[in-house]
Amino acid sequence: RKIVNIEAETMVDMARRQILPAVEKFSSKLAQDIAVKKSIAPVVSGIYETTLVTRLSDLVEDIDAAVEDLAAALATFHKIDDVTESANMVRDVLLPKMAALRAPCDEAEQRTAEGCWPFPTYGDLLFGVE
């Protein structure tokens, strides 16, 4: 119970304070780049960038909704005193909501430029240890 609570609280905090701002900053920069390219060369389609900005915006919405959903579930979880009831809530509610938050965050990581992502990549962790 305690470990899942810490993990869920950490997910909420990381998403709110680091992931959402990083994705927003990257997508805003990308949108500015599209505008600059089109002002210089109006024939530039910017399809890739426009599609990416749109998808990142959708992911921001998904992440935000999942964060709020998980935070609300945590608020309910904190009010439960019964061990069996809290264990059932972990299994039936918290873990699925944590997975629901992780999915759009993982996709956002894949679509956000490495230098803009606030955490080391899996490759950095696997091969960067000396």
What would you call each of these model-derived segments?
Residues 1-130:
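C-terminal amphipathic alpha-helical interaction region
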